[in-house]
Every structure is written in C-alpha cells, then in structure tokens.
Regions:
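Bacterial Sec-dependent N-terminal signal peptides
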Residues: 1-22
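Beta-propeller fold detector
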Residues: 177-179, 234-240, 279-286
Length: 312
C-alpha cells in the first residue's frame, strides 16, 4: 500500500528542482560531571534543528531525542523521553538545553529539567574540524528530472531522478560537480547529508537515493569522501555496497543493520584503517533462540581475521 500511495503522490506533483542539505555534527562533553555524546542535525536555510544525546554510562541505546532552534549562534533544544506508565510508554518533555556556539565550535550553556528546579552547566566540544573545512560556506544543487524506472511490480513508472550534484563556494563559483550516477528519488527533493563518515574530522557527502523496485530496504546513499590533498570529494563505491549505514563519531566505527522482520537480526560493525574499512564485530540474534551470537575480528594484513566467537 505504501508504494501505491507514493506512486499516486508522484502523479500529483508539479516538477521543481529542490535540494535539501543537512549537516550532522557530533559533540562530546559533560552535563555537570556526567559525560555525554550529543548529535545535532542542522538544515541549511532553516533555523530548526533536531538530534539526540546519551549519557556515556548508559550507552547509545538509551538515547534521548532533541529538537529545537538554532538562531544567532544560540541553540535551544527540548528533550523528549519515554516514560513508563500504566498506558504504556508515553513521550514527555523532560528537560532542555540552552547553549551558545563559540568561535572554536564549543557549545557552552546549561541543561535544566522540565520543572526548572534543577540546572547544570554544559560544556561540549565538536568532534568535526569545522575550522579547517566548514561546509556551511558552500551550496549544493542537484540536476533533477523526470525519468522512467521499473518499480516492484516490474512496471516502468515515472520518478524524479538525479544525475548530477553541483557544489558552489561562497563566491557562487562552481568548484566541483559530482556525476556518474543516475538514481531515483522518493519525492521531488534531492537530499544531501554532510557527515564525517571516515572520521578524519572533515565533513563528507551522502546523497540519498531510492530503489523503486524494492519492497524492503528501499533507501540508501551514495558516499563521497573529502580528499584533503586533492581538495575534492571522491566517490567510495565499495562503501555503497553496504548501502544504508550508521556512523558513530565517538567510537570511530560504522554499522549496517539487517533484520527480516521475524526476529532474525544481524549487525555488522566496521572500522577504517589506511583508507579502507574492515569488519570488526558481528552481532546476530535469532527468532528461535534467547541467546545472541557475537563474533569479533582483528585487522591483520589488510584483512578481517576472526579471533573470538561466543554466545550470551
């Protein structure tokens, strides 16, 4: 039904070239004496922001949602937590941040609870090196057109397509064109995400793409890593074979999640080494077992070598 609805929407849209740009920034620091990791997503041309944070001792699985406003180098964020009640888990506002973005890309300010009777100092340092290369000084424009692509019913249907991304500097000069691809979009907006995906401190480019011929896992990214020496973005097709990935700036690893919807899950964790990436850990859960299988690897001679496997 979802796919049919999407096709119906496409028929109603008027063609317009639109490019959405979101920058993903990661911060490490403390609320009072308690270490936290915070992620903020900033949309170019908008003052709304969203993200999450977690206390290091609790782990990323206990992340707390954030949304708010970025204006005049000040960020105000409201946190939402799920509270257990007799009616189940209910989302409630449990606190807020009021932060100032410093010239060295620190965030300083306060956190206070919803009742405003508790208040703590907050200090956070950006993990990305924005002083060296700040992509907010650049603009991005897709070439978007209509084309026919085979859908999951094996029929050709009209979709918005992208085949080029032009990058301009603050002087409106075109500095690079990313091309050599031809992919469908899920709507009429081309989406760029700027995130450090190889953990060298510099923001890279992720281009969202859509697979109309799939029922599951119908979205992914094209990945372009910024080459500091060449001062340009270089496509990483090997990374694209893993499709939709999640990047952990604190631990400098990324993960691919797989699930079949029946209780079988497979998480694969990777690390970078010498401009390549390697499998370092696998976690498998099975629908017919209460135990989880863990497999650990070490990088030896440019290969992932299994060193340990256990259940718990």
């Amino acid at each position: 039904m979802k796919k049919i609805f999407v096709l119906f929407i496409f028929c109603q849209l008027t063609f317009a070239q639109k490019t959405s740009v979101t920058t993903v920034l990661h911060f490490s620091g403390k609320i009072d004496k308690y270490p936290i990791e915070l992620t903020v997503n900033v949309s170019q041309g908008k003052d709304s922001v969203y993200g999450s944070y977690y206390y290091t001792k609790n782990g990323k699985d206990m992340s707390i949602s954030l949304k708010g406003i970025l204006k005049n180098e000040e960020i105000k964020l409201i946190e939402t937590s799920y509270i257990s009640t007799k009616k189940g888990n209910v989302a409630k506002n449990t606190g807020s941040f009021s932060l100032k973005l410093k010239s060295n890309y620190e965030l300083n300010g306060i956190w206070q609870n919803e009742k405003k009777d508790k208040q703590f100092d907050v200090t956070l340092q950006c993990l990305e090196n924005l002083a060296e290369f700040n992509q907010k000084n650049y603009t991005y424009k897709f070439n978007i057109y209509k084309g026919k692509v085979e859908n999951f019913n094996n029929q050709l249907s009209d979709y918005y397509m992208i085949d080029r991304l032009d990058i301009y500097n603050s002087k409106k000069e075109k500095i690079q064109t990313l091309s050599g691809f031809k992919n469908a979009l899920s709507d009429n907006i081309g989406q760029v995400e700027l995130e450090d995906i190889n953990f060298d401190g510099l923001l890279d480019i992720k281009i969202y793409i859509y697979f109309p011929d799939r029922i599951r896992d119908d979205g992914s990214f094209l990945y372009y890593i910024y080459d500091k020496t060449k001062k340009e973005f270089v496509r990483n097709t090997k990374l694209e074979k893993l499709e939709y990935l999640f990047f952990d700036a604190k631990n400098k690893e990324f993960v691919r999640y797989e699930a079949d919807g029946s209780g079988n899950e497979h998480d694969m964790y990777y690390k970078w080494s010498n401009n390549n990436f390697y499998l370092i850990r696998e976690v498998k859960a099975f629908e017919d077992s209460s135990k989880t299988l863990y497999t650990e690897y070490q990088i030896k001679n440019n290969k992932s070598v299994k060193v340990k496997e256990y259940e718990k």
